[in-house]
């Protein structure tokens, strides 16, 4: 299987969007010439429109951000170029000890705590989001490759947790018991502060697979981060 994962992310402006499309044009050009037996694309849950109910693989792909537009466009480019089995994995927010992104959430909170800096939340951290362990994403990629699966699959646990709760969990695990503070919100909450998922398709596709709980994943990330330092 060929796994397509490279992207300049998160895509924040038109220039980044153009570069990401150009990147995929190079990939699809190569795939057109040499058709692999199986292609897996790592996309994003950002392709979905906001919803008050749990999102699933059949939910409307109507992105409200350039990041979502970028991934949806790249999905369509691959569908046009790949003649064999194509699997599209759409992870929600990913966390892990070695994750290179310092985005708002578990990764940033853990690094701030390690540096002895207070954790500043957006608003009071009341948004509730799903977070998936990077090892679970890797595990799903391996299963998809082994089974030569095709179609769309979300990578999301089905459990939402507020950012304040996540910050409290991180601090409880850390050596530095830093302060957690709210801050004035500078705009509307992303996704209206709530983005749940229905993980039923994962269980149907891979019955033996189970997602890591947030508590276990944060504990493992903390241990791995400490060992690396």
Label for each model-derived stretch:
Residues 1-22:
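NAD(P)H-binding glycine-rich loop region in Rossmannoid oxidoreductase-like domains
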Residues 76-128, 134:
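NAD(P)-dependent short-chain dehydrogenase/reductase
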Residues 7, 40-44, 64, 90-92, ...:
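Active-site beta-alpha turn of Rossmann-fold NAD(P)-dependent dehydrogenases/reductases
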Residues 66, 70-73:
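Active-site helix of classical SDR
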Residues 8-11, 44-47, 93-99, 126, ...:
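Active-site proximal helix/loop that lines the substrate pocket
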Residues 23, 27-31, 77-78, 140, ...:
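Hydrophobic positions on the long internal alpha-helix
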Residues 117, 122-125, 129-229:
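C-terminal substrate-binding subdomain of Rossmann-fold SDR/epimerase-dehydratase oxidoreductases
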Residues 25-66:
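Conserved Rossmann-fold NAD(P)-dependent oxidoreductase catalytic core, especially the SDR/UDP-sugar
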């Amino acid at each position: 299987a060929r796994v397509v994962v490279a992207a300049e992310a998160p895509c924040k402006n038109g220039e980044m969007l153009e570069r990401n499309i150009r990147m995929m044009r190079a990939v699809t050009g190569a795939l057109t010439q040499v058709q692999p037996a199986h292609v897996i694309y790592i996309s994003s849950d950002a392709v979905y429109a906001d919803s008050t109910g749990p999102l699933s693989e059949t939910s409307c792909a109507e992105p409200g951000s350039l990041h979502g537009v970028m991934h949806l466009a790249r999905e369509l480019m691959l569908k046009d170029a790949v003649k064999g089995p194509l699997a599209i994995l759409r992870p929600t927010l990913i966390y892990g000890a070695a994750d290179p992104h310092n985005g708002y959430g578990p990764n940033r909170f853990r690094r701030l705590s390690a540096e002895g800096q207070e954790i500043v939340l957006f608003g009071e951290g009341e948004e509730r989001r799903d977070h998936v362990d990077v090892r679970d994403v890797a595990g799903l990629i391996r299963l998809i490759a082994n089974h030569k699966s095709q179609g769309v699959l979300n990578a999301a646990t089905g459990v939402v947790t507020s950012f304040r709760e996540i910050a409290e969990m991180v601090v409880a695990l850390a050596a530095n018991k830093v302060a957690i503070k709210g801050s004035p919100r500078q705009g509307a909450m992303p996704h209206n502060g709530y983005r749940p998922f229905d993980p039923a398709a994962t269980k149907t596709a891979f019955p033996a697979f189970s997602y890591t709980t947030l508590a276990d994943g944060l504990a493992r990330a903390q241990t791995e981060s400490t060992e690396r330092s």
